[in-house]
Amino acid sequence: MAEITASLVKELRERTGAGMMDCKKALVEANGDIELAIENMRKSGAIKAAKKAGNVAADGVILTKIDGTYGIILEVNCQTDFVAKDGGFQAFANKVLDAAIAGKITDVDVLKAQFEEERVALVAKIGENINIRRVASIEGDVLGSYQHGARIGVLVAAKGADEELVKQLAMHIAASKPEFVKPEDVSAEVVEKEYQVQLDIAMQSGKPKEIAEKMVEGRMKKFTGEVSLTGQPFVMDPTKSVAQLLKEHNADVTGFIRFEVGEGIEKVETDFAAEVAAMSKQS
């Protein structure tokens, strides 16, 4: 068998744009013949997938699945809403979800490695970059989920709650975007950052520092309530807080996860003229 040198792998990477491991694998299969490796990569769609890999995948789906006291939430991205609704893309995402819950896989890199060949083939077929972005799990006595279309997904774990209550809590979390369960759960880092912001605002009003600090204390209590689930007004009955709702049912929320498609991903905005110009350069 021919020796697969680093320089050979480097050359194939430069010519195809594919990843190092993909290039090495292709060269091994082609017994060191770089032209055959390129031909095989073209047939498999690896080159097309590599070219699409640089495209921003900020659309896609959020999926959830519960098995008893264990739940999984997954985000799989594509580039457009059109592909997010494609049957092939959705089937791929659901297959990844099934594998994640069956194997209790919460390491996204493990899922990526497991489904890389299928992902590459789908990219070649659909013509958009596809990315298994993130996965997380939750466990608890009672689990509930809610999906707002395929763009927002929530998992909730609770004690002493029935299925209807956890469903309502999941819907609340989807709408109100809490970051923590209780006000006391808000991290010291988040509290300190907000405290400094509020103190600067109060000081700019010309108040003495002692008065400004007292003003900020009140604002901070309001802030920790706003960013925590139990401190928020319940969306289905704003006359009571989520904490009051839980007390009425003698229930407690032990955790939740909320995913929204593309959050934290910077989309590339391209105007029509620029898009036409870009296409003309490719032709």
Swiss-Prot record:
A GO cellular-component term linked to this record? cytoplasm
Q: Where in the cell is it found?
A: Cytoplasm
Entry keywords, A to Z? Cytoplasm, Elongation factor, Protein biosynthesis
User: Mind listing the GO molecular function terms for this protein?
Assistant: translation elongation factor activity
Superkingdom per UniProt: Bacteria
InterPro entries assigned:
EF-Ts_dimer_sf (IPR036402), Transl_elong_EFTs/EF1B (IPR001816), Transl_elong_EFTs/EF1B_dimer (IPR014039), Transl_elong_Ts_CS (IPR018101), UBA-like_sf (IPR009060)
| Residues covered by region (Involved in Mg(2+) ion dislocation from EF-Tu) | 80-83
Return the CDD domains for the record. Answer: UBA_EF-Ts
Q: Principal place where this protein is found?
A: cytoplasm
Q: Does the keyword Protein biosynthesis apply?
A: yes
> Per the similarity annotation, which family is this?
Belongs to the EF-Ts family.
Q: What does this protein do?
A: Associates with the EF-Tu.GDP complex and induces the exchange of GDP to GTP. It remains bound to the aminoacyl-tRNA.EF-Tu.GTP complex up to the GTP hydrolysis stage on the ribosome.
* Protein name, entry field: Elongation factor Ts
Q: Could you tell me the gene encoding this protein?
A: tsf
